[in-house]
Amino acid sequence: YWTTLAQQLDTAGFDALFIADALGQLDVWQGKPDAALRLAAQMPVNDPLLLVSAMAAVTQHLGFGITVSATYEHPYLPAREFTALDHLTRGRIAWNVVTSMLDSAARNLGLTRQLPHDERYDRAQEFLDVTAKLWEGSWEEDAVSRDKANSLYSDPQKVHAIQHHGRWYQVPDAHLSEPSPQRTPV
């Protein structure tokens, strides 16, 4: 289904496909997920990061916008995932940053309820600061040379630890991935 959909959109000239995501059941209507299940409204839902990997392989021009929450993950992981997707899509990836709104998501990830609004947004700001440092401040533009003759893939002097020590996140090292076509997703 997903690869066929992507091919049809690509052939028809669509610019992009946006895939929303949530980490919990959409249970805001009457406190239960029945309506979401009955209408397939955000449930069932597959991980869009994995779907886009397959869809990118069968398309040439279609861009992909993906929702990923900045509330329940460490920023080091999505930074790496989006870099990989940007390589796979050849620069056709975008990130819809959200702070999550569902108590069910919080419960699914070990909390009793959603974090307070202001805390989610403060954490999200630091999350974005970390991803920006990883994407833009870790590898210099010319760090990768792929020089086979001299057995030099990348210059260690041009790859830098970001040394982020914040309120919520500690990221001392460099980004594990070399820069992608966009470096930072749209």
Language-model features, listed with the residues they occupy:
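A generic short-segment signal for beta-strand/edge and adjacent turn/coil regions
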Residues: 33-36, 63-66, 153-159
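Structural preference for beta-strand elements that scaffold enzyme active sites
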Residues: 16-18, 54, 61-67, 90-96, ...
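Internal, glycine-rich beta/alpha segment that forms the wall or movable "lid"
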Residues: 74-186
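Short, glycine/acidic-rich beta->alpha junctions
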Residues: 1, 47, 70-80
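Short, solvent-exposed turn/loop segments enriched in Gly/Ser/Thr/Pro and often Arg
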Residues: 18-25, 72, 98-101
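Residues at helix-coil transition
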Residues: 11, 57-60, 90, 136
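The substrate-binding groove and active-site-proximal loops of carbohydrate-active enzymes
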Residues: 37-43, 63-75, 114-118
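N-terminal beta1-alpha1-beta2 module of alpha/beta enzyme domains
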Residues: 1-58, 184-185
